[in-house]
């Protein structure tokens, strides 16, 4: 079921009961936008028909690059008391190991929920993409107060749907599971018992938990103003402001593809010069090169038109590539990417100052995204700690700390900075100990001890 249809169905179900009536903050306008961003990321944009308009796969490239920059050389760990060792082991193995891929999904679709849950073997983490959850309400700090998660599968002619509703009310977390079965995609169908579906038979219909001041998941959203719906607290795709620019870029890319296809070398050859194979009911081409030759019927003699004519027009690739490259630069600006990220870096006709400004713009956005991801991961670890303590895997309490180290190489060229520091040492404005401490990861005391002895000069 499409995301916008699912939103309507979920709202209708919740509003049937006075106890669950909601004023959904996720509007149909935002639902349609999320559908578009998802289609663009999955290479199914509405303007792409695979014939006249091909996809240059720009949305996926943008989301992938931003996710790479955000998680580049990222370091994070959980330290502290007795619980920290267990939490950190699960955190490193089940969260950080494959985090970049899920951050890419979040960047593409505007948001991502990181939701821990308990299994028979311990903690697990579910990554819910923006087209599979429905935030119903938020608090003033931007944390979700109520959210619906959906899961759906087909079995024969029946469609099974599970709604998992998380609500924070009066310092209590309420989790409910409701299951529906239908025979079409137009509605969720009839509600049935949760235990009647094998896949969900171990889930409880209702659960209430005390001792948490937030819902038990982390919510990552792209830190951009929502230009699609300025009243919505939801995140937007990293390419949300470039959909029309990307559509034009796909058109220009398609023109380039057609230029190469339409100007392929060909030989127009008269039918009279070809041998006709009666057994196969077709003409035979010299050397079997059907792609090279194009059969032509001439109604006039050879004096008016040669029997063999070579078709080899000039390719206008330079002009077309320049136009495509210019479009990519517009996309880079709209998506907070430095010039040369998507476009040809050799053709970036910018001054050193302009290039630095574009890198600074990208760095600022990446830094904001890193902080948004950090908040989501902190909430995730809080939820992991809650579940692990609830099931007796660790002692109760919050005796842990989460640390983060983010890379800044997007704006700082390490080799260039190192060369500058060497010049400062030569001028005497930076000591050798300071240089060694900075570049060798030593304290000033260690660096001073490790400096080479000055060479003895004989008089």
Regions found by a protein language model. Give the residues of each.
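Amphipathic alpha-helical protein-protein interaction segments
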Residues: 104, 110-115, 424, 430-439
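Extended, helix-rich architectural segments
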Residues: 1-145, 154, 158
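Long, highly charged low-complexity segments enriched in Glu/Asp and Lys/Arg with interspersed Ser/Thr
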Residues: 439-459
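Alpha-helix capping/termination and helix-coil
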Residues: 328, 332-339, 366, 370-392
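Active/binding-pocket-proximal capping segment
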Residues: 331, 345-352, 376, 383, ...
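Extended, non-catalytic structural segments that build the interaction scaffolds
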Residues: 31-53, 298-334, 350-373, 401-434, ...
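Extended, regular secondary-structure scaffolds
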Residues: 108, 113-236
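Extended, charged amphipathic alpha-helical segments
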Residues: 198-354, 401, 405
């Amino acid at each position: 079921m499409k995301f916008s249809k699912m939103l309507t169905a979920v709202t209708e179900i919740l509003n049937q009961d006075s106890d669950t009536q909601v004023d959904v903050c996720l509007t149909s306008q935002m639902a349609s936008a999320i559908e578009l961003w998802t289609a663009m990321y999955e290479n199914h944009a509405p303007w792409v028909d695979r014939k006249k308009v091909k996809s240059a796969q720009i949305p996926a490239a943008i989301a992938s690059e931003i996710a790479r920059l955000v998680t580049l050389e990222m370091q994070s760990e959980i330290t502290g008391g007795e619980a920290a060792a267990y939490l950190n082991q699960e955190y490193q193995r089940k969260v950080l190991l494959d985090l970049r891929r899920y951050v890419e999904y979040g960047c593409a679709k505007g948001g991502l929920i990181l939701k821990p849950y308990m299994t028979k073997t311990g903690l697990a983490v579910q990554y819910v993409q923006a087209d599979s959850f429905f935030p119903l309400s938020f608090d003033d700090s931007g944390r979700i107060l109520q959210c619906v998660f959906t899961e759906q599968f087909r079995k024969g002619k029946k469609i099974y749907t599970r709604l998992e509703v998380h609500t924070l009310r009066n310092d209590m977390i309420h989790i409910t599971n409701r299951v529906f079965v239908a025979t079409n995609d137009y509605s969720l169908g009839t509600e049935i018992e949760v235990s009647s579906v094998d896949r969900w038979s171990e889930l409880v219909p209702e659960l209430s938990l005390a001792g948490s001041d937030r819902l038990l998941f982390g919510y990552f959203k792209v830190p951009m103003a929502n230009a699609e719906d300025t009243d919505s607290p939801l995140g937007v795709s990293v390419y949300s402001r470039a959909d029309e620019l990307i559509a034009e870029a796909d058109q220009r890319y398609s023109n380039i593809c057609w230029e190469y296809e339409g100007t392929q070398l060909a030989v127009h050859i008269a039918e009279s010069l070809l041998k006709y194979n009666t057994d196969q009911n077709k003409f035979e081409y010299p050397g079997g090169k059907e792609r090279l030759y194009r059969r032509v019927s001439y109604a006039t003699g050879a004096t008016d038109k040669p029997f063999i004519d070579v078709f080899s027009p000039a390719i206008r690739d330079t002009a077309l590539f320049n136009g495509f490259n210019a479009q990519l630069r517009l996309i880079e600006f709209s998506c907070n990417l430095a010039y040369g990220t998507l476009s040809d870096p050799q053709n970036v006709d910018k001054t050193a100052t302009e290039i630095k400004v574009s890198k600074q713009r990208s760095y600022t956005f990446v830094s904001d995204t890193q902080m948004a991801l950090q908040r989501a991961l902190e909430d995730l670890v809080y939820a992991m700690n809650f579940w692990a303590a609830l099931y007796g895997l660790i002692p109760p309490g919050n005796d842990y700390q989460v640390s983060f180290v983010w890379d800044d190489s997007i704006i700082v060229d390490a080799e260039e900075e190192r060369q500058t520091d060497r010049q400062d040492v030569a001028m005497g404005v930076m000591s050798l100990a300071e240089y060694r401490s900075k570049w060798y990861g030593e304290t000033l005391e260690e660096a001073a001890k490790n400096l080479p002895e000055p060479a003895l000069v004989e008089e």
